[in-house]
Amino acid sequence: MKYLTSGESHGPQLTVIIEGVPANLEIKAEDINKEMFKRQGGYGRGRRMQIEKDAVEIVSGVRNGYTLGSPITIVVTNDDFTHWRNIMGIEPISDEERDNMKRTITKPRPGHADLIGGMKYNHRDLRNVLERSSARETAARVAVGAVSKILLEQLDIHMYSRVVEIGGIKDEGLYDTETFKQNIDKNDVRVIDETIAQKMRDKIDAAKKDGDSIGGVVQVMVENMPVAVGSYVQYDRKLDGRIAQGVVSINAFKGVSFGEGFKAAEKPGSEIQDEILYDNEIGFYRGSNHLGGFEGGMTNGMPIIVNGVMKPIPTLYKPLNSVDINTKEDFKATIERSDSCAVPAASVVCEHVVAFEVAKAITEEFQSNHIDQLKAQIDERRRLNIEF
C-alpha cells in the first residue's frame, strides 16, 4: 500500500490517492467520515474547525460499496475556500495584484516551516509554504488511515488511541480494553479519568488566555496483531522503524517511543525484557509488554504500544520575535488562525498514521489480491504462533 496527498490548507480541496488496497473490501464514506469527525474534535481547537465539516467523497476505486483493487481516490472539500478564493485562486494575476495581495506573509513564525521552506523553494510570499505545511493536510492522512482501519478490522486487528499528557498533566492509568473502548471518545481531551481531564482543560484555558500554546503526549494501541510482521534482515523492513518515521512525520511531532519507551533507559535488563511463555490455546506470548509489541523490528503478538510527543503549536497569539524577509527588520511573527492545543486531535491523527503503516506492512507480508485471500493468510500466520 502507498498513498499520495495534495492540496493546500485554504485551497479548494484535499485529495488523496491510495494504492494497494485489496479488492472486495467493503468501504462506505460514512465510516470514513466518523473518523474524520474525531479529528475535528478535542478541547483547545480553533475557529477553523467551526467552519470545516469534513466529509469525504470517494471518486474512484470503489464500486457499489466494495473496493476494486485499483487506486482509491478520496476528496475532502475545504469549505473555508469560499473566503479565500481571491487569495488562493489558481488563475494567474498581474504584478500589481500580487503586490496588493492580502494576507501576504513576510514575517516567518519561529518553529514553523515558513522561513526555511521559503529559502528552499524561493518563495517571497511565505504563504506558499504555510499553505502546504499546515496541519490541515492531516485530514487527508486520517482518510487514508480510516481506509486502513477498515481493512485491519476485517482481519480482527483493532486500533485505539488516547492522550496521556497535556502540558505536564498526565494520565498514566492502566485500563482494560473494554473500559478504554467504552469511554475514550466520551471525553473532549480523550482521557479516561475525568478529574485529570478537567485539569487538562484548565491548563489549555490558561495557555489560551495567555496567547500561548501547549503540547503533550499521545498513545496508540494495536491489538491482535499476527506475529512476525516486519523483518530483522534489513533496517528498512523493521516495522517499528517504519511506524516511528510515520509518527514523527506528523506536524509538530518531535519524538516517538514504544512500550515503556525512554523509561527503559532507567531500568536493568531484567526488568525490561518480556519473558516468553506458552499456552496450548494461544501459543507463545509474553508475561509483560515493556517493549511495546516488538522484538527485532517484528511483531511478537503482544499489543503494539506507540507513544508520540507533540510540541506546542508554533502559531502564537502572543507572537515571538522574527525578522521580515524583505526589510530584514525585527518584527513580531505573523499571527495565523490556529489552535491553542491540538493534542486530543493529534491522538486521532497518530492513530490513523500508525494504522496505515500497519496495513502497509500486512499487505506486503501477505501478498493478496482480494480480502478473502488475505484473511486466509492471516489465519495461517496466527496458527503458526501455536504450532511452531
UniProtKB/Swiss-Prot annotation:
<dbReference type="GO" id="GO:0005829">
    <property type="term" value="C:cytosol"/>
</dbReference>
<feature type="binding site">
    <location>
        <begin position="251"/>
        <end position="252"/>
    </location>
    <ligand>
        <name>FMN</name>
    </ligand>
</feature>
<comment type="subunit">
    <text>Homotetramer.</text>
</comment>
<feature type="binding site">
    <location>
        <position position="337"/>
    </location>
    <ligand>
        <name>FMN</name>
    </ligand>
</feature>
<dbReference type="InterPro" id="IPR035904">
    <property type="entry name" value="Chorismate_synth_AroC_sf"/>
</dbReference>
<feature type="binding site">
    <location>
        <position position="45"/>
    </location>
    <ligand>
        <name>NADP(+)</name>
    </ligand>
</feature>
<dbReference type="GO" id="GO:0009423">
    <property type="term" value="P:chorismate biosynthetic process"/>
</dbReference>
<dbReference type="GO" id="GO:0004107">
    <property type="term" value="F:chorismate synthase activity"/>
</dbReference>
<comment type="similarity">
    <text>Belongs to the chorismate synthase family.</text>
</comment>
<feature type="binding site">
    <location>
        <position position="296"/>
    </location>
    <ligand>
        <name>FMN</name>
    </ligand>
</feature>
<feature type="binding site">
    <location>
        <position position="39"/>
    </location>
    <ligand>
        <name>NADP(+)</name>
    </ligand>
</feature>
<dbReference type="GO" id="GO:0008652">
    <property type="term" value="P:amino acid biosynthetic process"/>
</dbReference>
<keyword id="KW-0028">Amino-acid biosynthesis</keyword>
<protein>
    <recommendedName>
        <fullName>Chorismate synthase</fullName>
        <ecNumber>4.2.3.5</ecNumber>
    </recommendedName>
</protein>
<dbReference type="Pfam" id="PF01264">
    <property type="entry name" value="Chorismate_synt"/>
</dbReference>
<keyword id="KW-0456">Lyase</keyword>
<dbReference type="InterPro" id="IPR000453">
    <property type="entry name" value="Chorismate_synth"/>
</dbReference>
<comment type="pathway">
    <text>Metabolic intermediate biosynthesis; chorismate biosynthesis; chorismate from D-erythrose 4-phosphate and phosphoenolpyruvate: step 7/7.</text>
</comment>
<keyword id="KW-0057">Aromatic amino acid biosynthesis</keyword>
<dbReference type="GO" id="GO:0010181">
    <property type="term" value="F:FMN binding"/>
</dbReference>
<keyword id="KW-0274">FAD</keyword>
<dbReference type="GO" id="GO:0009073">
    <property type="term" value="P:aromatic amino acid family biosynthetic process"/>
</dbReference>
<comment type="function">
    <text>This reaction introduces a second double bond into the aromatic ring system.</text>
</comment>
<keyword id="KW-0285">Flavoprotein</keyword>
<feature type="binding site">
    <location>
        <begin position="132"/>
        <end position="134"/>
    </location>
    <ligand>
        <name>FMN</name>
    </ligand>
</feature>
<keyword id="KW-0521">NADP</keyword>
<keyword id="KW-0288">FMN</keyword>
<feature type="binding site">
    <location>
        <begin position="311"/>
        <end position="315"/>
    </location>
    <ligand>
        <name>FMN</name>
    </ligand>
</feature>
<dbReference type="InterPro" id="IPR020541">
    <property type="entry name" value="Chorismate_synthase_CS"/>
</dbReference>
